[in-house]
Amino acid sequence: MRLSQMLFVTLREDPAEAEIPSHKLLLRAGYIRRIGSGIYAYLPLMWRVLQKVSQIVREEMNAAGAQECLLPQLQPAELWRESGRWETYTKAEGIMFSLIDRRDTELGLGPTHEEVITTIAKEMIRSYRQLPVNLYQIQSKFRDEIRPRFGLMRGREFIMKDAYSFHASEDSLKETYQAMDQAYRNMITRCGLEFRAVQADSGAIGGSASQEFMILAEAGEDEVLYTEDGKYAANVEKAVSLPPDAELSPFTTPEKRETPNTNTIEKLCQFLQCSATAIVKNVLYQAVYDNGKTVLVLVSIRGDQDVNDVKLTNELVRLAPQYQATTLLALQVPDETAQAKWAAKPLPLGYIAPNLEDNYISSIPDITPKFLRLVDKTAVELKNFITGANESGYHQVGANWGQEFVLPSLVVDVRKAMAGDRAVHDPIQTLQTARGIEVGHIFQLGVKYSQAMGATFTNEQGEEKPLIMGCYGVGVSRLAQAAVEQSYDKDGIIWPVAIAPYHAVVVIPNINDAQQVEVAEKLYTELNKVGVETLLDDRDERAGVKFKDAELIGIPYRIVTGRSLQSGKVELVERSTKNSQEIAIDQVVETLKKLINV
């Protein structure tokens, strides 16, 4: 391709809307263009990158025995109601775009395709002889993100590969799950990226086990906790660990003490000269279920620990049937405005005890009249602890479960693991932290969808059983931007060869120099002929502008037909190292073929 014929515009300044390096560079280098909030156009250079990523993904999926198909983006609401996810995905903080057609039929724009594929399997799969089967597609998805940001990282329209497998047994599912794990490792490795596979929370997709594939990058939205021995890695949402040992409480006798202006853990520790590990703090949450019922949740946890909202959400979803609900729509720490809607009297915030009385809750329809009390394992172990006294300016010291306070019946693990915690598999090791960008996620779904939607098969014994499912997603457009986030410098993008839009760019410093043009044209033709995908910068621009643009767009190799032509050579510059060498014109093609491994 000739740059003079390409829709190609670069920017010298960072766009104001861009927050992270990869977003800035893709906009500046003319790869993408913002059309609206979270909506981007993929311009010619970017489309080539996306096609290459898609092809690598396609090849690895095919090699693993999956079959490509294409599913509808418009999905009937009744399918999602059948699975029980319509309310979750369209109400409160739901991410599905929903619409009503001219026949007053509700539809959703697909954020994912479990319901559609399960319906197809329900209608087409009858016998164990048809199993296992693994279907995948590469298409645009739509999600109504609350806060679209970071360009293609968190957009409202994006390209994704999603796959769904069906099985007659758990063993068969695990076999495919492992095959997908290896396929994903192959995909990301072939794209030339550093990554870490980590244990993950299954979220709204559900299932018994899941794993994320994280591209390591400082601007990553996710925190990964891992051990140096490589035996443990998990998203912080899922991570488990051993917290530091608690220090002994300085109080051995139960007593209510005046503690003025100590409504934070830090202030309380200073006032009482105690460790935060000797404190039980009580955190109030407001949970809204899909049947409209609001439950006030009181979580007791050790004072130096924080509640992991994802773990807490999972616990509350598990408890949903107790409230005649199926899932959770929203979870928040209620602010003054939210409290005013249900609090019968002012709450002693900062001084709440585990036994906060239920009469703080007004008698209102759809507000559960009693607190749901949960206690984290870290708080259960404490003796002679310090906690609130349900009165502003006062705390209880020297308290114990079973004496001053009744231990809640629901003992849970909802603490947030942190860097520096001890590893469960080897307490000598401590957890390290890294930032990551999630580009892939694989799930063992089990029978969650097939059971809800009546997708069954007949097994070898002639029994009707629900299909066992797995699902596997790769963010194609996100992976492409993650590559930039992992590999750039002050001058621009540094694409890995495998997914670069072009392998090489031939730059003509002076288009009025006939020899420069002639040699450039010859190299451009010969390189493309042997499979070295080459761009020709034949624009009527200053040489400096061309060199700057070449570095900005990140093509792996730059060939310059400049002054060295007088000695029968051209300059070859490697983008990643900026190493420059002069090579004979007749050696350029073979040299490039070896460098990019054609």
Curated annotation (Swiss-Prot):
GO molecular function, a single term: aminoacyl-tRNA deacylase activity
Any one Pfam family match given in the protein's UniProt record, by short name: tRNA-synt_2b
Top EC class of this enzyme: ligase
PROSITE patterns assigned to the protein according to its UniProt record, in alphabetical order: AA_TRNA_LIGASE_II
Keywords of this entry: Aminoacyl-tRNA synthetase, ATP-binding, Cytoplasm, Ligase, Nucleotide-binding, Protein biosynthesis
Coiled-coil regions listed: none
EC assignment: 6.1.1.15
Entry keyword annotation includes Transcription: no
Gene3D superfamilies according to UniProt: Anticodon-binding domain (3.40.50.800), Bira Bifunctional Protein, Domain 2 (3.30.930.10)
InterPro entries reported for this sequence: aa-tRNA-synt_IIb (IPR002314), aa-tRNA-synth_II (IPR006195), aa-tRNA-synth_II/BPL/LPL (IPR045864), Anticodon-bd (IPR004154), Anticodon-bd_dom_sf (IPR036621), Pro-tRNA-ligase_IIa (IPR002316), Pro-tRNA-synth_IIa_bac-type (IPR004500), Pro-tRNA-Synthase_IIa_type1 (IPR023717)
Coarse class of the protein's main subcellular location: cytoplasm
GO term, biological process aspect, one: prolyl-tRNA aminoacylation
Keyword Protein biosynthesis: yes
Subunit annotation: Homodimer.
Family: Belongs to the class-II aminoacyl-tRNA synthetase family. ProS type 1 subfamily.
Protein name: Proline--tRNA ligase
Protein species of origin: Rippkaea orientalis (strain PCC 8801 / RF-1)
